[in-house]
UniProtKB/Swiss-Prot annotation:
The gene is KIF1C. This is Kinesin-like protein KIF1C. Its main location: cytoplasm. Residues 523-590 form the FHA domain. Keywords: ATP-binding, Coiled coil, Cytoplasm, Cytoskeleton, Disease variant, Methylation, Microtubule, Motor protein, Neurodegeneration, Nucleotide-binding, Phosphoprotein. It comes from the Eukaryota. InterPro entries: FHA_dom, Kinesin_assoc, Kinesin_motor_CS, Kinesin_motor_dom, Kinesin_motor_dom_sf, P-loop_NTPase, SMAD_FHA_dom_sf. GO terms for biological process: anterograde neuronal dense core vesicle transport; retrograde neuronal dense core vesicle transport; retrograde vesicle-mediated transport, Golgi to endoplasmic reticulum; vesicle-mediated transport. Monomer. Interacts with BICD2.
Length: 1103
């Protein structure tokens, strides 16, 4: 049986009174083992279907052939688990579902015939099978324990001396256990029934005194079933120990649907913590089974419930789960969540083994091997006499086994496992040198307790059980709870004649569980030395008294007399004077103690007299809810007005705290060192989370949404433009913690804060699928930012659940999104993929923008260079005309009216008359002047040609002119376009001169390209010379050109520097090398405006 999956069954109950009053519709249907649910808000969508091991339809009556009764549920699940318990396996059955879904009814049931739940039927069947299997070699023993887990505290329900919370510990051999939890020996089903009844009474009394609700606590009823077998051949005793755990989980409900607030909301948070941890454990185990993630970390110790159920979930146990469903459409979200929970659970596989002694296991395996070999020999035709001889030898060997067998090897304690990052202490002697004396003493005492408990005989256990039973009866008698004539405590029965009080509780399982007799004469109620002892905040030492006075006609009249200052209500009205009670009256003492007065004899006499019932009691059942509603109505308390007043107070408080947060954020924005948007948003996120979380502790998510929408979120007052492009995430600093030591829990909390902030900024328009996608995206982003692994695969699910619990989801949008998506986790995965694709698209766009920044810069450089080059031919034409005319034209001063009038003519090139066909040199010269693209290409070619000739010439031939004609152009290896700028020191010498010495040596043109003397030619560009100041330069450019500035015409174009970037004018050095200088040059108006144009005229030494 090892390696079997968890058995999962779902059961749907009938409508309750609340659902019937609201005209609820059934949205759950079952066909065989398939359960389907329809979204009431998206009725056109296909229903979601789930398949389980069992689907029980209990929505109708017993006349329906499809109706599943309590007996059928036990036959399918209970009998199978009980069979595993007899085989020696651990067994666990737990019920899960929302409050009021029928978990307690399925597990415990009622006292009426045919209404018993799984637990009573299993206990009764256990003892019936034990009585049927009695033999001399077999003996059985049964021990039970009953505990309650409320707000992460463990309470023993069978030990009246246990007052506080018990500690949960983990032994490396025994596993998790509750320290000092009583285990009582029982010998019959009646003993178990009495103990269960006592446990329920203790649970009811404690819940009433502390104003608790049993539906908010987990109940665990454990049966330890031991089978001892004596082997006559070996003379050894073997034991098989089975642990049967029957768990009734607390209700999984939403705070907004239950109206919880204050302490109830805190209880719900603890319930959600335990149930959420249970969901995490189930998800982690399911992922391990599906081979999605192999992780050794299972968060068992995150809650007491999962810690105690560690062996039952994925461990050494046979486990079954019953999911209780509500069929109403108003509970659609809770029902769908329960179905998904159950669907996840069925993927878990448990590795159960038989719990028996090692020697017994060895002997059993050897006996099975002998039987198998004997059958093999018989099949091969071995004679019967030979088999008899083998039997004789086998018997002699078995007889010698006790003498030669070694003692059982001690079970070596396994190494302690690591949970939540801390090492669980072990009992191995290697660690005793590392612990302190106090811890060593505590471990020693605990080990001695365990040894004493294991060595305790059965008779001692029975005596201990009897002593505890007497103590419980004495305690109940002291409290005024009725006791049977045979000494057993009261179950659910009503006396025939005696007037009495029966308790009412919010949980139906705890209603009518306590019965208080009203004796003849005076019965006092209070806290100390009273006939009926009650405790609580509003119960006085002497609260009230009941007078039972017989009348002459035989009728007994009971009168209630309240004490001064004590709050006592009858049928919702405050009682200040003695009042005669009628059967069926509702009595409220203090705030928490609610009773119904029953007078059987009075009711019988009224029926005999034909007295009509009073008009007061309604047709609905008189339970705790009716008593509370009646109390509020009679006291004139309008629940709606009270809730509105409370909401207004909370809204005013939120508004005040928001204003304080706004002032704080504004101060931080003004005086902080950094005023970036990220820092401001981060501070706003933290303040928003603080206010929303404090508000959520007192109100449901829907009300929180209303208040936040109305009042807004804290802000520093600085408006931020919406970001259109995905920004690469920067590392955030976690509040109060070094990011280097950030854990996965810190990242989850940070993700919850940021997602809640984003959802609140969007006016809570996010649906369930959108929140899941945000959670997955945010967790990946944070893990990548902080260098953490992606963590558990369902980490984003926990984040999404926390966001739902905090801010809820869109009203109707969440259900719609859930209905339109794929079933279960598929829809979330699709949304996750979509969000991931959007994120990758954004990152790709950002990378494109970053990579194209240099291209944009180069394009801007090219555009500006083209605009500058349009000026260069004009300056060259003016220079040619001036030199051909032999005089320097007058240039008006800069800024004068003449300069403004001359500017348009300077910009336009002068018209040239048509000329005869040009030679190749003239054509090249014309293109160099008129075509900037041709000029750039030819200048680049000349530059490469000069460098090549300079390399060929060598160091010895640089004194004279170059005589070799230019050869074929060899393109360089690096053809990247370069822009030498005069303002950059590294580029000033990028085109060095070809000659050596103080004066540059011009190149002589080769003979092949020497122009014909008869052909008129324009003056080619002058060779590279030293810089000369312009007319508008800072060092005075008004000097006239001398006569010695004439130069012989060079035969080759020399490359010139040109600048495409406008640069501010820089002063030239005062000391210049001696030599002839050019006459003053008038800068064109466009160049004067740019102020950074390259020098178009350069001064050079005369050749």
């Amino acid at each position: 049986m090892a390696g079997a999956s968890v058995k999962v069954a779902v059961r749907v109950r009938p409508f309750n009174a609340r659902e019937t009053s609201q005209d609820a519709k059934c949205v759950v249907s079952m066909q065989g083992n398939t359960t389907s649910i329809i979204n009431p808000k998206q009725s056109k969508d296909a229903p979601k279907s789930f398949t389980f091991d069992y689907s029980y339809w209990s929505h109708t009556s017993t006349e329906d052939p499809q109706f599943a009764s309590q007996q059928q549920v036990y036959r399918d699940i209970g009998e199978e688990m009980l069979l595993h318990a007899f085989e020696g396996y651990n067994v666990c059955i737990f019920a899960y579902g929302q409050t009021g879904a029928g978990k307690s009814y399925t597990m415990m049931g009622r006292q009426e015939p045919g209404q018993q739940g799984i637990v009573p039927q299993l206990c009764e069947d256990l003892f019936s099978r034990v009585s049927e299997n009695q033999s001399a070699q077999l003996s059985y023993s049964v021990e039970v324990s009953y505990m309650e887990i409320y707000c992460e505290r463990v309470r023993d329900l069978l030990n009246p001396k246990s007052r506080g919370s018990l500690r949960v510990r983990e032994h490396p051999i025994l596993g998790p256990y509750v320290q000092d939890l009583s285990k009582l020996a029982v010998t019959s089903y009646a003993d178990i029934a009495d103990l269960m009844d006592c446990g329920n009474k203790a649970r009811t009394v404690a819940a009433t005194n502390m104003n608790e609700t049993s539906s908010r606590s987990h109940a665990v009823f454990t049966i330890v079933f031991t089978q001892r077998c004596h082997d006559q051949l070996t003379g050894l005793d073997s034991e098989k120990v089975s642990k049967i755990s029957l768990v009734d989980l607390a209700g999984s409900e939403r705070a907004d649907s239950s109206g919880a607030r204050g302490m109830r909301l805190k209880e719900g948070a603890n319930i959600n913590k335990s149930l959420t941890t249970l969901g995490k454990v189930i998800s982690a185990l399911a992922d391990m089974q599906s081979k999605k993630r192999k992780s050794d970390f299972i968060p068992y110790r995150d809650s007491v419930l999962t810690w105690l159920l560690k062996e039952n979930l994925g461990g050494n146990s046979r486990t079954a789960m019953i999911a209780a469903l509500s069929p109403a459409d108003i509970n659609y979200e809770e029902t769908l969540s329960t179905l998904r929970y159950a669907d996840r659970t069925k993927q878990i596989r448990c590795n159960a083994i038989i719990n028996e002694d090692p020697n017994a296991r060895l002997i059993r395996e050897l006996q099975e091997e002998v039987a198998r070999l004997r059958e093999l020999l018989m099949a091969q035709g071995l004679s019967a006499s030979a088999l008899e001889g083998l039997k004789t030898e086998e018997g002699s060997v078995r007889g010698a086994l006790p003498a030669v067998s070694s003692p059982p090897a001690p079970v070596s304690p396994s190494s302690p496992t690591t949970h939540n990052g801390e090492l669980e202490p072990s009992f191995s002697p290697n660690t005793e040198s590392q612990i302190g004396p106090e811890e060593a003493m505590e471990r020693l005492q605990e080990t001695e307790k365990i040894i004493a408990e294991l060595n305790e005989t059965w008779e001692e256990k029975l005596r201990k059980t009897e002593a505890l039973r007497m103590e419980r009866e004495a305690l109940l008698a002291e409290m005024g709870v009725a006791v049977r004539e045979d000494g057993g405590t009261v179950g659910v029965f009503s006396p025939k004649k005696t007037p009495h009080l029966v308790n009412l509780n919010e949980d139906p399982l705890m209603s009518e569980c306590l019965l208080y007799h009203i004796k003849d004469g005076v019965t006092r109620v209070g806290q100390v030395d009273m006939d009926i002892k009650l405790t609580g905040q509003f119960i006085r030492e002497q609260h009230c008294l009941f007078r039972s006075i017989p009348q002459p006609d035989g009728e007994v009249v009971v009168t209630l007399e309240p004490c001064e200052g004590a709050e006592t209500y009858v049928n919702g009205k405050l009682v200040t004077e003695p009042l005669v009670l009628k059967s069926g009256n509702r009595i409220v003492m203090g705030k928490n103690h609610v009773f119904r007065f029953n007078h059987p004899e009075q009711a019988r006499l009224e029926r005999e007299r034909g007295v009509p019932p009073p008009p007061g009691p309604p047709s609905e059942p008189v339970d705790w809810n009716f008593a509370q509603k009646e109390l509020l109505e009679q006291q004139g308390i309008d629940i709606k007005l009270e809730m509105e007043k409370r909401l207004q107070d909370l809204e005013n408080q939120y508004r005040k705290e928001k204003e304080e947060a706004d002032l704080l954020l504004e101060q931080q924005r003004l005086y902080a060192d950094s005023d970036s948007g990220d820092d401001s948003d981060k501070r706003s996120c933290e303040e928003s989370w603080r206010l929303i979380s404090s508000l959520r502790e007192q109100l449901p998510p829907t009300t929180v949404q209303t208040i936040v929408k109305r009042c807004g979120l804290p802000s520093s007052g600085k408006r931020r433009a919406p970001r259109r492009v995905y920004q690469i995430p920067q590392r955030r600093r976690l509040q109060g913690k070094d990011p280097r030591w950030a854990t996965m829990a810190d990242l989850k909390m940070q993700a919850v804060k940021e997602i809640c902030y984003e959802v609140a900024l969007a006016d809570f328009r996010h649906g369930r699928a959108e929140i899941e996608a945000l959670a997955a995206l945010k967790m990946r982003e944070l893990c990548r930012t902080y260098g953490k692994p992606d963590g558990p695969g369902d980490a984003w699910r926990a984040v999404a659940r926390d966001v739902w619990d905090t801010v809820g989801e869109e009203e109707g949008g969440g259900a719609g999104s859930g209905g339109g998506s794929e079933e279960g986790a598929r829809g979330a995965e699709v949304e996750d993929l979509r969000a991931h694709i959007d994120k990758l698209t954004g990152i790709l766009q950002e990378v494109k923008l970053q990579n194209s920044s240099k291209d944009r810069e180069l394009q801007a450089l090219r555009d500006r260079m083209l605009r500058m080059e349009r000026v260069i031919p004009l300056a060259q034409d003016h220079e040619d005309e001036n030199e051909e005319g032999g005089e320097v034209p007058w240039a008006p001063p800069e800024g004068s009216e003449a300069a403004e009038e001359a500017a348009p003519s300077d910009r336009m090139p002068s018209a040239r008359p048509p000329s005869p066909p040009l030679s190749s040199w003239e054509r090249v010269s014309r293109l160099m002047e008129e075509d900037p693209a041709f000029r750039r290409g030819r200048l680049r070619w000349l530059k490469q040609e000069q460098l090549r000739l300079q390399g060929l010439q060598g160091s010895g031939g640089r004194g004279g002119g170059l005589r070799r004609p230019p050869a074929r152009f060899v393109p360089p290896h690096d053809c990247k376009l370069r822009f030498p700028f005069k303002s950059n020191p590294q580029h000033r010498e990028s085109w060095p001169g070809m000659g050596s010495g103080e004066a540059p040596t011009p190149l002589q043109p080769p003979e092949e390209v020497t122009p014909h003397p008869a052909t008129p030619a324009r003056r080619p560009p002058s060779p590279r010379r030293s810089h000369h100041p312009r007319r508008n330069s800072l060092d005075g450019g008004g000097r006239s050109r001398g006569a010695g500035s004439a130069q012989p015409e060079p035969q080759h174009f020399q490359p010139k520097k040109h600048n495409s970037y406008p640069q501010p004018p820089q002063p030239y050095p005062a000391q210049r090398p001696p030599g002839p200088r050019y006459p003053p040059y008038t800068t064109p108006p466009r160049m004067r405006r740019q102020r950074s144009a390259p020098d178009l005229k350069e001064s050079g030494a005369a050749v």
